[in-house]
Amino acid sequence: MDQLKKPHILLCNDDGIEGEGLHALAASMKKIGNITVVAPAEPHSGMSHAMTLGTPLRIKKYYKNNRFFGYTVSGTPVDCVKVALSQILPSKPDLLVSGINYGSNTATNTLYSGTVAAALEGAIQGITSLAFSLATYENADFSYAAKFARKLSKKVLTEGLPPDTILSVNIPNIPESEIQGILVTEQGRSRWEEDAIERHDVYGNPYYWLNGTLMLLDTSLQHDEYAVRKHYVAVTPISCDFTNRDFMGSLEQWNLKK
């Protein structure tokens, strides 16, 4: 990237164009580059890497306080990245930043996350990409998260990332003075103990709300969720490649036949 030119930064999320974290991120990232915001028209949390097939997508301009803010896409976070690259941007951006998500995306939740998926789609398309998430579902304060997103983005623009790799960053929802430090972490293991809540409509037909408790299986500071719970910022390199190479040798010994 030309050091004399401001970087072009694509911003997206999964909480939708009105997401508070997206607006905090945009205000922060404007200080280091030229931004384009492309986000879902509606919240799409938990969509993972879903994309829309068989249904047309629509792009609309979005205004905040009568000023142009960005574009909405009537689809998923991954749709937003694909549409941004093919229909909105004249060329690939220097950086893609997804977030700031309302709620952490650590451990197994990484697989469910539309925020992380948008960044992974960027990496698949050859764009240096980051995902940021704030570990709370209430009383969110995005000020430090937005500040750290800007700081890390500047570093990544200088240093770069390996191919097909993103950084997924999870930040505690506490004042900056209480942050214990920054840790490079692994994706931890966790499991949801599901508890679907049954309700009935006015006709007596049952419907269900998915609910559950996240059970943490890794409890050391080298793992993302535990680190965040101990008031550290967790920076986790995530790869697009899901291959379990440690098991390949054992699998080959099965001598599978056609």
UniProtKB/Swiss-Prot annotation:
- Pfam families, per database record: SurE (PF01975)
- Keyword Cytoplasm in annotation: yes
Which coarse location class describes where this protein primarily resides? Answer: cytoplasm
Top-level taxon of the source organism: Bacteria
An example GO CC term for this entry is: cytoplasm
- A GO term for molecular function: 3'-nucleotidase activity
Please give the InterPro entries that the UniProt record associates with this protein.
SurE (IPR030048), SurE-like_Pase/nucleotidase (IPR002828), SurE-like_sf (IPR036523)
The record's annotation in SUPFAM superfamilies points to: SurE-like (SSF64167)
Which reactions does this protein catalyse?
a ribonucleoside 5'-phosphate + H2O = a ribonucleoside + phosphate
- Write the Enzyme Commission number(s) for this entry: 3.1.3.5
UniProt keywords, alphabetically:
Cytoplasm, Hydrolase, Metal-binding, Nucleotide-binding
> Which residues make up the binding site for a divalent metal cation?
14-15, 45, 101
Instruction: Supply the enzyme class, top level.
Output: hydrolase
Subcellular location, in the record's words?
Cytoplasm
Cite the cofactor comment: Binds 1 divalent metal cation per subunit.
Q: Does the keyword Disulfide bond apply?
A: no
Q: Which cofactor does it need?
A: a divalent metal cation
Note the NCBIfam families from the entry: PRK00346.1-4, PRK00346.2-2, PRK13932.1, surE
HAMAP family membership: SurE
Family, similarity comment: Belongs to the SurE nucleotidase family.
| Protein purpose | Nucleotidase that shows phosphatase activity on nucleoside 5'-monophosphates.
> What protein am I looking at?
5'-nucleotidase SurE
Q: Which organism is it from?
A: Chlorobium phaeobacteroides (strain DSM 266 / SMG 266 / 2430)
